Amino acid sequence: MRITDTAGFHAWFAERGAAHRYRITRTPLHDLEGWYTDPASGDVRHRSGRFFSIEGLRYGRQEPDGPAWTQPIIRQPETGVLGVLIKWFDGVPHLLMQAKMEPGNINTLQVSPTVQATFSNYTRVHHGSPVRYIDHFLTPGAGDRVHYDALQSEQGSWFLGKRNRNIVVETTGEIPVHEDFCWVPRPVMAELLRVDNLVNMDSRTVLAGLPDDPGEGSVPRRAVEKPLHDTAALLHWFTGAKVRHRPERTTIPLSRVGGWRRDDDRGEIVHETGRYFRIIGVDVEADSREVTSWSQPMLAPVGRGVVAFVSKEIHGERHLLVQARAEAGTFDAVELGPTVQCNPGNLPDGAPRPPYLDTVLTARPEQVLFDTVHSEEGGRFYHAENRYLVLDGDDVPVDVPEDYTWMTVRQLTRAGRIGNLVDVEARTLLACVRTLPDHGASR
């Protein structure tokens, strides 16, 4: 199936939602089929020893007065594949996307990449159906051209060292299209990114790495770039931030995580303040998935987060205010993150407000360039949402705190294509920024 406009996409998407049967049932952790609580550590594990586990983490930083805490965290050592196939039709690049159910999606069905599969999925550990189109990404054929292939991190607050392989492959061959998939023009994908809870996280992270093209949503080609900081200066700043923020993290038994308790009545793990997140259990039925029923733990955040880039025109070029951000589970300790990335409801009473949070929350309507609520990874997180914003902050000073710097959209796009440099929330915003008509152009 190949659609030509947004209306055609929504008609196809509604049809796919009606074609399948899904049911997600909240279930106590101690009743999850195939899962158990380790009596020695309290960790929640699958009886096969595969997939993922819920463990404890102790985190702190070596700098004076650095934060320190313990928390539950998802440990998933496997590296999955997130891949998008591109093909040109009538001079327009189209992306092969799928309508995919995930148990944590707030609206069940969202737009996923061509391939979204864990290592266990595509090696069929669970004896499920083969993953469609996986060979184009693992063993590209004669008609396939790899444009982008990088190991990228995922949510460092909730995953321990989690990475997935992000791949974009252009194909010229004939592709049989399953009814749950369709070719979407790249300009239409740009429009879909503005719809709440429609394009899933796995799609967004790959879209951030798409190659430039002359169509809508590309980074404009400029004869001369005029960034505030050149590459050497940015690397110097980023290396300095990694030296300043030297984390010490150790996995610990889940039973030894302070401030968290198991609520036996509800079968959940919760924080004593009711903040942050809960670890819950679900039973899932989905006739469109490789395995049609299963049980699993999930991380359910409390409240909606705010993720934002403040932008500013400098030297006639649109710049983004980027943060060197350390998170407990980040694979390489520090990554490039958005200007603001937090859940305001989780801020401790009396604690200092994160820099620029109030700038974002009090922005005037005319400053808002992008404002959409997106879901996070629905395979491990239950109803996790963030409000993603891009603001015109031309009244924000050029001089910024030491953990912040200004980068052009093109500079951040290049960094994002390397892998393990730009965090997943910033990659979502990067995918969104690249849809704005004047994001890199001078006025």
UniProtKB/Swiss-Prot annotation:
Gene Ontology molecular function: any one: lyase activity
UniProt cross-references to InterPro entries, sorted A to Z: EvaA-like, EvaA-like_sf
Family classification: Belongs to the hexose 2,3-dehydratase family.
EC number: 4.2.1.159
Top-level taxon: Bacteria
This protein's pathway: Antibiotic biosynthesis; granaticin biosynthesis
Keywords: Antibiotic biosynthesis, Lyase
Protein name: dTDP-4-dehydro-6-deoxy-alpha-D-glucopyranose 2,3-dehydratase
Organismal lineage: Bacteria, Bacillati, Actinomycetota, Actinomycetes, Kitasatosporales
Note, other: Two binding sites (pockets A and B) for the dTDP-sugar ligands have been identified in each subunit. It seems that pocket A represents the active site and pocket B is a vestige of the gene duplication event.
Residues reported in the UniProt entry to bind dTDP-4-dehydro-6-deoxy-alpha-D-glucose 2: 157, 260, 325, 341-343, 346-347
Designated gene of the protein: gra-orf27
Function: Involved in the biosynthesis of the 2,6-deoxysugar, dTDP-L-rhodinose, attached to the benzoisochromane quinone chromophore to produce the aglycone antibiotics granaticin and granaticin B. The product of the reaction, dTDP-2,6-dideoxy-D-glycero-hex-2-enos-4-ulose, is a highly unstable diketosugar, which spontaneously forms dTDP-3,4-didehydro-2,6-dideoxy-alpha-D-glucose.
Biological processes annotated in GO: antibiotic biosynthetic process
Organism annotation: Streptomyces violaceoruber
Assembly and oligomerization: Homodimer.
Pfam entry (one): Hexose_dehydrat
Residues the record lists as binding dTDP-4-dehydro-6-deoxy-alpha-D-glucose 1: 35, 118-122, 377-380
Enzyme class, UniProt record, top EC level: lyase
Catalytic reaction equation(s): dTDP-4-dehydro-6-deoxy-alpha-D-glucose = dTDP-3,4-didehydro-2,6-dideoxy-alpha-D-glucose + H2O
